[in-house]
Amino acid sequence: MAERSRIERFRTSLHVRRPPVNRSEAEMGVVRMLVGCLIVVAVSSTQGAQPTSPKTQGAVLFEGAQLIAGDGRAPTDNSAFVVENGRFVQVGRKGTVPLPQGARRIDLTGKTVMPALIDLHSHLGYYDVKTMINSAQNYTRANLIDHLNRYAYHGIAATLSLGLDRGELPFQLRAATGSDTALFRTAGRGIAWPNAGPRADYWRDAPYGVRTEAEARTAVQELAARKVDFVKIWVDDREGTVPKLPPALYRAIIDEAHAHKLRVVAHVYYLADGKDLLRAGIDGFAHGIRDLEVDEEFIGLFKARPEVFLIPNLPDRAPGASDLAFLSETLPSEQIAPMRETSAKGSPARPRLFDVQARSLARLNAAGVRIGFGTDAGVGSPLGWSAHAELADMVEAGLTPAQALVAATRMSAAILRLDQHGMVANGKSADFIVLDASPLENITNTRRIAAVYLAGREVDRAKLRAGWSGRSSD
């Protein structure tokens, strides 16, 4: 959880009876055999359940857009690509990609296409957008789906919910989400010293609270049984206000997680803790170091383990004037006024916090560290907007627009092991954003969204917008 929110305090079986039919023993034997086979297939399918896949879709040829593939290479002007059954099946330049028989053609001349975003750090389900209240009572399937729809609206294809999930719901949702909204991945319950993880009361009890190595290992074992996507730990004393998870415990967590082939990502604040976590085998950081600028020793520890990643999660800020119009697409007008007031006041602490982390991010990026993308969204912040604000912050910190886009697409998909996502390339899931202008020229152009496609289906943004803000059009 970030030190402040993006806006501070913003708030069926069908039974048919049939007459008996006389069958021979041979016939009944065949029937029993077939039923047995069907049961085996059904059980196997259930055990290997994956997120829902799109229904069969006809081919569509998209032509004329500038294409940013997500691999960091120069964009392709006047591109052409074919989407069929939820995947990119051919990508190239207009004139070299033929129109498949029976396919539709969509002209994107003047537009820019880029991969949909991947958010590696969210806390969904607690914030009720209508009431502007955070509460554990809001952690329902309906609210989680609403949050994922807001992600889809803003061009986010998948998110990792990082350590504050409860009960069976997150795992059910992980298996159920797919082509209709953003993919949901979960770290389940995180691990911290008791009552020393997230700040707020409404989710302080969500993580495991551990005091001994045995408790720490047991928590990891329970998470491993749920096949979580990551293990999240908090190593932070909140400016001396709570006990910090000690090295003996986080080393036990990392060791046990690795024994179960799980990776561990840390919420961290202090440079000294970051160094020791790297020595202990941490797999990634959910925030940048915040007390000091990183030094050569820290960079060297990172470079010695090139698979370790950083999610910068840059300091929060209130939305500026240009953001308010973007936010008004998905929020009712009565919520915009207090945001405008917050924006006018600004945050006196942000320049110092941002400068420290920006310099560190620039140095780590130059050193070749794996830079991912995350927002900490859900802590009362406008869902979806946070991703576009983070992209702008990363560029403000010194990354080029192309580098920020790679971090938010291909690299984050790789970190989350979503191998079929994060790029516009043959065989990949057709998750992409159509923009009215190029973010390579101005990163804030990621907000100029003309359309979003997930698994080849266009998200009905007008319908979603009308339901949230009462506005059916921009």
Predicted regions and their residues:
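Divalent-metal coordination cores built from histidine and acidic residues
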Residues: 108-237, 241-264, 297-343
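Histidine/acidic-residue-rich catalytic or RNA/ligand-binding cores of hydrolases
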Residues: 129-132, 171, 244, 274-280, ...
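Mature N-terminal segment immediately following signal peptide/propeptide cleavage
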Residues: 55-90, 108-115, 119-124
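Bacterial N-terminal signal peptides
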Residues: 33-44
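Divalent metal-coordination and catalytic microenvironments
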Residues: 65, 81, 86, 110, ...
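Glycine-enriched alpha-helix->loop->beta-strand junction motifs that scaffold or abut catalytic
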Residues: 278-285, 304-309, 368-369
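Acidic, glycine-enriched loop/beta-strand segments at the rims
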Residues: 51-53, 67-80, 92-96, 382, ...
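His/Asp/Glu-enriched, well-ordered alpha-helical/loop segment
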Residues: 259, 342-344, 348-438
